[in-house]
């Protein structure tokens, strides 16, 4: 064996109890597991004393914003050091593909607070396929440090096809968005994300989202929404997501699903009951969450939706105009 991890605590992901063992690796693959007191110890060209350490399958980060970080840091130690081996990026409806030149400039400006401005990255892609090829190339041609799966950002798609206007998409604009989603799925995306408290994605109505989810379902993908409300309207926002994906026949993964605002204290069982009812009816639903009450967003998300119409430049102009304040 090339490597033996001696006396490591194995947490194998099956749900069973952990156990101590020697674990052998040959040519990058596990080639032997010898439990404690299970006979002779494994031997190999290199032996590491792993007593007191844990060994587990790589973790999947279902909600990551490493869209540019993967291209900046060849080691990606912020995630790799935590045991993450797969990240799902393209989250919250805003990322960097599919785009044209104008859309790329706008989305870079819009989410600088999430990912930085991307200085030092050449942004030589426009389609999802080209972006995934860029990830394969990675940092200086060496690939990226972890695996990545990409969600099509619905807000970026709407920015591309409709712009920043707070209105329903026209038939031609909807057809354009559906075509972009289909092409992106064919190029390797795994689903569609939304950020329905962020502009311009929030301007999409249920009918528009349902049509896009139908396209995603045709490729066996899933819809991952940051839904419309985390406050008093949270449960209704979850109901909207469940209903429209059932209508579209699309799998649903609820992003950072919480009831952690004060107004929702004690209401988590209502959310679970909603999801259980949908699951019993045959829906394909999963979620990710976190065990603490704070959250993180951008200051622009605190603005009323009317103040965000038109994009970043229009927002800045309104902020400079005292007469534009809501009374």
Predicted regions: what is each one?
Residues 1-21, 26, 304-327:
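Active-site microenvironment of metallo-dependent hydrolases
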Residues 72-190, 283-285:
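Divalent-metal coordination cores built from histidine and acidic residues
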Residues 169, 178-308:
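Functional cores that coordinate and move charged inorganic groups
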